[in-house]
């Protein structure tokens, strides 16, 4: 099996291609390949497959074998791989149009140098943002925000991001009974004020640890800032490892024209 190892702001993936048809892969095989001691090592595995109606299809799995959700960083990596492997782009602006578990996406390579690229990815509309009442504690807002940006996210604003125990606090809210049975990804955001970059740390379910970045979490954090009253044309957000930009439109309670821009890198390719 040929595979490609990618990272997007430290969020790393194993990518495989199967343009001839749907690839069968069991959850235990995903777990084995993503294991950092006995496998290749990754936060998730992505399959680039052929599509009857679009340029290609994307399937994503967390490193615990769970699937059926979208991954923003993985979506940007798969767009870069489509470009490197010569898959034609059908969009008039040079973008690839592809199907994913949550619907149809467009992705375009903005720039590329060697193994590194900057990729912009369109995401689906966000139709519901739910305010969640939180216990009043030092350093934490009394209101958090829950939404689905391709997968389920909770955004909590804090003013102590550097000292925060993300593993402990992330697990606490990921398994909170209000979000059972599936749980949520948990993003902790430090907000400095208008025009300042938002800082984000994410506890990712499926990985069950703090990831260096999470694309759908970055989007959720920007939307939560908008809900908090910070209205911008474009948001700059810094994860533990890199910087992203997010833009969207808002009308009648719906966030549309959602776009995520950030870095990708082809680390290596090999045969297993």
Regions found by a protein language model. Give the residues of each.
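Intrinsically disordered, low-complexity regions enriched in acidic/Ser/Thr/Pro/Gln residues
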Residues: 119-121
């Amino acid at each position: 099996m040929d595979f490609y190892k990618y990272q997007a702001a430290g969020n790393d993936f194993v990518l495989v291609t199967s343009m001839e048809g749907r690839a069968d892969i069991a959850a235990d095989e995903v777990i084995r390949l993503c294991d950092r001691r006995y496998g290749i090592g990754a936060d998730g595995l992505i399959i680039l497959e052929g599509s009857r109606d679009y340029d290609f299809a994307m399937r994503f799995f967390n490193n615990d074998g769970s699937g059926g959700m979208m991954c923003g960083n993985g979506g940007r990596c798969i767009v870069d791989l489509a470009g490197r492997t010569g898959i034609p782009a059908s969009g008039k602006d040079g973008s690839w149009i592809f199907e994913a578990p949550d619907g149809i996406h467009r992705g375009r390579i903005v720039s590329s140098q060697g193994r590194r690229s900057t990729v912009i990815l369109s995401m689906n509309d966000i139709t519901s943002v739910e305010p969640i009442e939180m216990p009043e504690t030092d350093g934490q807002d009394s209101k958090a925000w829950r939404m689905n940006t391709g997968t389920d996210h909770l955004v909590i604003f804090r003013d102590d991001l550097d000292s925060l125990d993300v593993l402990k606090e992330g697990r606490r809210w990921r398994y909170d009974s209000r979000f059972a049975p599936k749980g949520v990804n948990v993003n902790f955001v430090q907000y400095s004020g208008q025009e300042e970059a938002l800082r984000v740390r994410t506890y990712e379910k499926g990985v069950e640890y703090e990831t260096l970045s999470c694309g759908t979490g970055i989007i959720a954090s920007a939307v939560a800032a908008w809900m908090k009253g910070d209205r911008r044309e474009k948001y700059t957000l810094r994860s533990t490892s890199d910087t992203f930009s997010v833009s969207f439109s808002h009308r009648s309670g719906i966030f549309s024209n959602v776009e995520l821009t950030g870095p990708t890198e082809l680390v290596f390719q090999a045969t297993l």
